Amino acid sequence: VIAQTNFAVSTSETRPVLTGVNWLIQENELICTATDSHRLAVRKLQLEDVSENKNVIIPGKALAELNKIMSDNEEDIDIFFASNQVLFKVGNVNFISRLLEGHYPDTTRLFPENYEIKLSIDNGEFYHAIDRASLLAREGGNNVIKLSTGDDVVELSSTSPEIGTVKEEVDANDVEGGSLKISFNSKYMMDALKAIDNDEVEVEFFGTMKPFILKPKGDDSVTQLILPIRTY
């Protein structure tokens, strides 16, 4: 849960609430949300034995430390909230963090409706193709990758004035809709794909300048949203 959201917190102190992850507990469900205004990560998880609803913001730095303590095979984690603190009981370890003050923004309105294009793609192939294409983008100092869809293929390209252009193609499955061109930050995209623990990724595009969504195929528990970059 932490690894799938914490990477998207803001590192800027201009809006302190965005340096934390919003934990919303209601109706036996935990919804974790993190955003730095350029991307958004959401993870949903069913809970047991919830005594009351909560809406708190936990500092991203504290969650990063907690993640180091937790091992993958821990059966249960007990969580206790006080007015301005949270306690995690992990095995024999008690981990206490302060809570951030303020109201977390309503991020549900960021999600567009009615996609123009939807497709499925192999997570590993997509990730490594972006990684290869981003080498030139990083050389150019901008991290921008251009993506175009069409005929069951996704084409990725990046350009460096000094070196030239690199192009990568990845096969897409279950393509709905026409063709589209969009640009994005390669690091944001790779972070999002890494957070999706699934071999197949579903991508929904809503327009060249609208946010696009990634999630595991057939699973709504993890959602990654990325804002595009204007290049076209």
Language model features with spans:
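DNA polymerase processivity clamps
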Residues: V1-K44, E48-L100, Y115-Y232
